[in-house]
């Protein structure tokens, strides 16, 4: 009967991730996030991947947007953090976004998208917007 059936969660929340300064803002960091997304959508079959952060954390917000997470809103006074009310910004990628986003990551990670100094030719955002 439905009342005794347990349904697995179809959402995965990206908890805290901390890259060392050596890895920050490198193609390897972007590839690591891409590999996590492959696992979430292709490997585990989730429908939704969430990114939540302090609404004052501009670096986290910028990273979420660059990686293709879409802003969904602010949970006002979601938590108390370091003695202050913390508003939480919510972002997500859903399964219908995944095929185009996956193609954008694959195009961005292609060695032909990097010059001889290892600098990107097109940004991930530019590739996503040109699809």
What are the roles of these predicted feature ranges?
Residues 64, 91:
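Conserved active-site tyrosine of GNAT-family acetyltransferases
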Residues 16-27:
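A short, internal acetyl-CoA/4′-phosphopantetheine-binding micro-motif in the GNAT/acyltransferase core
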Residues 70-84:
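Conserved catalytic-core motifs of GNAT/GCN5-like acyltransferases
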Residues 24, 37-41:
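A conserved short alpha-helix in the GNAT/GCN5 acetyltransferase fold that borders
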Residues 42-52:
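Conserved GNAT acetyl-CoA-binding A-motif
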Residues 51-60:
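Conserved beta-strand-loop-alpha-helix junction that forms the acyl-donor binding cleft
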Residues 1-12:
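Short, small-residue-biased leader/transition segments that mark boundaries at the very start
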Residues 99-131:
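Acidic/histidine-enriched, glycine/proline-rich intrinsically disordered or flexible terminal extensions
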């Amino acid at each position: 009967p439905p009342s005794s059936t347990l349904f697995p969660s179809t959402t995965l929340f990206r908890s805290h991730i901390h890259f060392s300064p050596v890895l920050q803002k490198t193609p390897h960091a972007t590839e690591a996030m891409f590999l996590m997304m492959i696992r979430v959508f292709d490997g585990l079959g989730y429908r939704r991947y969430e990114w939540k952060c302090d609404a004052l954390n501009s670096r986290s917000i910028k990273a979420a947007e660059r990686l293709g997470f879409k802003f969904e809103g602010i949970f006002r006074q979601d938590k108390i953090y370091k003695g202050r009310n913390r508003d939480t910004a919510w972002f997500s990628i859903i399964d219908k976004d995944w095929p185009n986003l996956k193609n954008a990551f694959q195009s961005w990670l292609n060695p032909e998208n990097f010059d001889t100094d290892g600098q990107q030719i097109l940004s991930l955002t530019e590739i996503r917007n040109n699809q």
